[in-house]
Design a protein with these regions (language model features):
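Primarily recognizes the serine-hydrolase "nucleophile elbow" in alpha/beta-hydrolase
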Residues: 61-64, 118-120, 125-175, 186
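Solvent-exposed loop/turn segments at secondary-structure junctions
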Residues: 51-55, 81-86, 134-138, 160-163, ...
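Alpha/beta-hydrolase fold active-site loops
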Residues: 44-46, 175-176, 254
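Bacterial N-terminal signal peptides that target proteins for export
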Residues: 1-7
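The feature captures the conserved acid-bearing segment of alpha/beta-hydrolase catalytic domains
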Residues: 152-235, 245-250, 261
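Hydrophobic h-region of N-terminal signal peptides that target proteins for export
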Residues: 10-19
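Catalytic active-site module of serine/aspartate enzymes centered on a nucleophile-bearing elbow/loop
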Residues: 277-304
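Serine-hydrolase catalytic machinery in alpha/beta-hydrolase-like enzymes
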Residues: 22-129, 139-142, 146, 191, ...
């Protein structure tokens, strides 16, 4: 569930330069984050959550969110997980690699950030969104489960639910949600179970079962309403994209972007790796037909 797998992958992926982070105190614990706000306020605000072993700065340097935000005049906040991990609805024994300290309240941390920027007039309370990759995708789903009242829409990337996670998830209301998963992911297998990587955790649901869960939560029909193969604009990346839509009540949209033959990486208009072939070997290919941030923002901007 992680873009950086130990020291070797840290060298192979683009390394994030250190950036000054803001901080906030949560129950006596100093939590850090990086925020980028436009001059025109209140603005839409997207909470962007990093993967395991990462920090918010990785999402700034490895995705197109900053460029998109400047163009669209939206705010971004990049929180940092303690020990570079998030306390999602799974127990620590069900995770791989890093785990957050016992008792970490990441739901409270992220909610406090949203309340802070809404409270000071920086963010429009009707246009708050949350997205994340891998462990950050699991934390995104956790925020929908625990604080659906805060968000107009959500998007999870390269993550599936587990039995434990789903049993603890009881959203207070439907939240439009977009999923983006690769069929050749070695860490979070598309068909569920345990991934082929030695770093993988076990017990994942399949992407189809995870999709059905959110369809049920949002009151959607159980069958696909449309399946569209998107243009294969980059023939060299060995992957393609299929958009799968659902028939849902208004305001409860559920959409899956299936990255055919895609790995444990967010699609992007530029590479997330310094040595792409080596990272392709460890994590699978990165799709370049779509840009993950652009697709997610295109979904978000429809809500409310």
């Amino acid at each position: 569930m992680f873009w950086r797998l130990g020291c070797a992958a840290t060298v192979l992926l683009w390394s994030a330069s250190a950036a000054p982070a803001d901080s906030i105190n949560i129950d006596g614990v100093t939590r850090t984050f990086t925020v980028k706000l436009p001059k025109a306020r209140p603005a839409p605000l997207v909470v962007v959550l990093h993967g395991n072993t990462q920090t918010g700065e990785d999402m700034i340097s490895r995705t197109s969110w900053p460029q998109l935000a400047r163009r669209e005049n939206i705010g971004l906040v990049f929180p940092d997980g303690l020990n570079r991990a998030w306390a999602d609805l799974r127990s620590n024994s069900k995770r791989a690699l890093r785990t957050p300290p016992a008792g970490t309240d990441d739901v409270g941390f992220i909610a406090r950030l949203v309340e802070k920027f809404v409270g000071d007039g920086s963010a429009d309370p009707k246009r708050i969104y949350v997205t994340g990759v891998s462990n950050g995708g699991a934390m995104t789903m956790t925020m929908v489960c625990e604080r659906a009242d805060l968000f107009a829409a959500a998007a999870s990337v390269i993550i599936n639910l587990t039995d434990e996670f789903a049993a603890a998830c009881h959203p207070s209301r439907p939240v439009p949600i977009l999923m983006m998963n690769g069929t050749a992911d070695p860490l979070v297998p598309y068909r569920g179970g345990r991934g082929s990587s030695r770093f993988a955790a076990d017990g994942f649901w399949s992407t189809e079962k995870t999709l059905d869960f959110w369809r049920h939560v949002n009151g959607c029909d159980g069958q696909d309403s449309a399946s569209v193969d998107l243009a294969d604009s980059d023939h060299d990346d060995t992957t393609t994209v299929t958009r799968i839509e659902s028939r849902c009540p208004r305001g409860g949209d559920v959409v899956l972007y299936r990255i055919n033959d895609g790995g444990h990486r967010m699609p992007g208009s530029f590479s997330d790796a310094r040595f792409p072939r080596a990272v392709d070997f460890m994590l699978g290919p990165q799709n370049h037909d779509i840009d993950g941030a652009e697709v997610i923002w295109g979904f978000f901007r429809r809500f409310p």
